[in-house]
């Protein structure tokens, strides 16, 4: 009988009696011959409802522009915070677009093929969600020409560029809102916003604002998207940057725009400019109503995957100070293998395969604490979560700095500067795991397919902390196993459910043994392994 062993420390006595799997969950393989969504390097979609084919093959990297890198070629204001000082809510560090361009080799070495940028337009905030001008690059980030240079450099390396679109609200400094502040009822733009009376009070907190704002924050006046002029303006912004050459839009709080047909029109108009444009919505909860029929978004930021994966890999190591006051960010309580299986099954059942392939999967972001801090500094949790992220269907997204073990609590601490000058403090284990897993994803089409067959745990998992899944695509077949528990686990799956003739351990440590009637999997505590099987 063939036996494949990893680290010799994983040798165990197979005379033990592991539980046998009686339940296997299978998600039907997507057929590239009948559905073009899965074809690599395919041409642009011919139907408005098609998802861009490049997304399922992409590995994203999220950049918060003020904190990633800064170039000496961009003139800066004097009053900047020190790069390595703790971030504050309102302070600027001075990161810029040419700084990103000068570090593209780093991203290429990681295997990154797409960048999602937090907002880059003129704004009065370091995060730039307070938009002043949707048609100009923020001067601290550089010039419009700097953006063109960055875009060209990314495309030369095969890296796609996705921008953050904030279309639900603008800012107090947005020209048309400022005109309303100056001219009141006589402003030609009074209908662009939800005005409840005059005078407007954008700063006097002891007076009613007299206008609607996002979450009541006066700095963020909400657009009246029922107004034809305002709506056409926002559509034009989407078209303009699509015409400038971007590859996608990440849409901020899109579910808060209630105007009927708004996002359908946005998709139609922007995809008319670039038929291969990726449109992904920031929706924290289950988002099938926004993505399933392909009339609005290609996919969603997949926070249900985030929270399930953290609950499984981090478990009771979770730092309570990193918890968010968000009912959809349910990283606690901890779950075992069965709990993780249930949440992943629920997630995959809620989306058709094209949407699953276009979802943006992540572990952390500018809106959450960083995963290393969530896990109270436990690097095992990060490595296990990366293994699940980079073998899951859809596009994985790595938040800048996660690959070197950058930590940080809730906003603003999760927006620390990238520690370029402190390489000695980088977490080399996390960095190597990130590089190796990204490379493995690029090498194996199976890891980018929708064929996701859960082999373990069964329905009666009885507290098992192991999770095993088969990933397959034509002749490419892999077994991915994670043991999130504190003890070694040995589990058996019947040969009828999972059989192989040869297996090669390509990442991690573990032992895989094929018997006459069963396949035995053995993993040490807090470990993961990936095999290529035939």
Describe the residue ranges of each PLM region.
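Carbohydrate-interacting/catalytic domains
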Residues: 1-64, 68-70, 75-114, 148, ...
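Substrate-binding/active-site clefts of carbohydrate-active enzymes
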Residues: 49-60, 64-113, 120-244, 266-272, ...
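Hydrophobic faces of well-ordered beta-strands that scaffold small-molecule active sites
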Residues: 59-61, 115-117, 161-163, 249, ...
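Conserved, mostly hydrophobic/aromatic
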Residues: 63, 107, 117, 134, ...
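Short, flexible loop/turn elements at secondary-structure junctions
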Residues: 64-67, 121, 138-141, 167, ...
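Active-site-proximal helices and loops of the catalytic beta/alpha 8
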Residues: 151-160, 168-169, 174-185, 236, ...
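Active-site groove signature of glycoside hydrolases
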Residues: 234-257, 361
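Active-site clefts of carbohydrate-active enzymes
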Residues: 354-376
């Amino acid at each position: 009988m063939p036996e494949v062993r990893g680290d010799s420390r994983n040798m165990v006595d197979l005379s033990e009696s592991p539980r046998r799997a009686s339940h296997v969950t299978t998600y039907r393989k997507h057929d590239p011959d009948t559905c073009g969504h899965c074809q690599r390097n395919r041409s642009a979609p011919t139907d408005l409802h098609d998802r861009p084919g490049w997304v399922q093959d992409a590995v994203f990297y999220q950049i918060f522009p003020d904190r990633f890198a800064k170039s000496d070629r961009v003139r800066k204001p004097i009053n900047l915070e020190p790069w390595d000082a703790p971030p504050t809510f309102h302070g600027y560090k001075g990161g810029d677009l040419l700084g990103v361009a000068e570090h593209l080799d780093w991203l290429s070495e990681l295997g990154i093929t797409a960048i999602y940028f937090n907002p880059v337009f003129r704004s009065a905030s370091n995060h730039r969600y307070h938009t002043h001008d949707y048609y100009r690059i923020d001067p601290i980030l550089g010039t419009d020409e700097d953006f063109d240079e960055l875009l060209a450099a990314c495309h030369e390396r095969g890296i796609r560029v996705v921008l953050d679109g904030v279309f639900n609200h603008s800012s107090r400094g947005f020209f048309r809102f400022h005109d309303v502040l100056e001219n009141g009822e006589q402003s030609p733009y009074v209908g662009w916003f939800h005005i409840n009376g005059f005078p407007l009070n954008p700063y006097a907190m002891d007076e009613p604002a007299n206008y609607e704002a996002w979450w009541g924050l006066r700095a963020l006046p909400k657009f009246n998207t029922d107004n034809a002029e305002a709506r056409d303006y926002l559509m034009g912004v989407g078209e303009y940057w699509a015409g400038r050459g971007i590859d996608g839009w990440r849409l901020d709080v899109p579910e808060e725009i209630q105007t009927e047909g708004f996002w359908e029109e946005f998709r139609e108009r922007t995809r008319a400019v670039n038929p291969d444009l990726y449109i992904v919505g920031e929706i924290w909860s289950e988002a099938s109503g926004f993505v399933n029929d392909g009339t609005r978004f290609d996919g969603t930021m997949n926070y249900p995957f985030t929270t399930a994966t953290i609950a499984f890999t981090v478990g009771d190591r979770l730092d309570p100070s990193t918890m968010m006051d968000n009912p959809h960010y349910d990283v606690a309580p901890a779950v075992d293998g069965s709990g993780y299986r249930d949440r992943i099954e629920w997630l995959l059942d809620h989306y058709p395969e094209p949407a699953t392939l276009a979802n943006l999967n992540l572990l952390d972001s500018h809106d959450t604490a960083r995963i290393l801090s969530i896990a109270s500094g436990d690097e095992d949790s990060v490595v296990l979560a990366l293994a699940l992220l980079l073998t899951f269907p859809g596009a994985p997204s790595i938040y800048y700095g996660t690959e070197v073990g950058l930590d940080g609590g809730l906003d603003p601490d999760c927006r620390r500067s990238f520690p370029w000058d402190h390489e000695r403090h980088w977490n080399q284990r996390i960095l190597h795991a990130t590089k190796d897993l990204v490379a493995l994803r690029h090498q194996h089409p199976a890891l980018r397919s929708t064929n996701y067959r859960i082999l373990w745990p069964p329905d009666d998992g009885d507290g098992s902390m192991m999770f095993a899944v088969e990933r397959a695509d034509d002749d490419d077949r892999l077994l991915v196993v994670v043991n999130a528990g504190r003890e070694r686990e040995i589990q058996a799956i019947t040969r009828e459910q999972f059989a192989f003739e040869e297996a090669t351990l390509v990442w991690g440590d573990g032992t895989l043994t094929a018997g006459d009637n069963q396949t035995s999997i053995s993993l040490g505590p807090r470990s993961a392994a990936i095999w290529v099987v035939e």
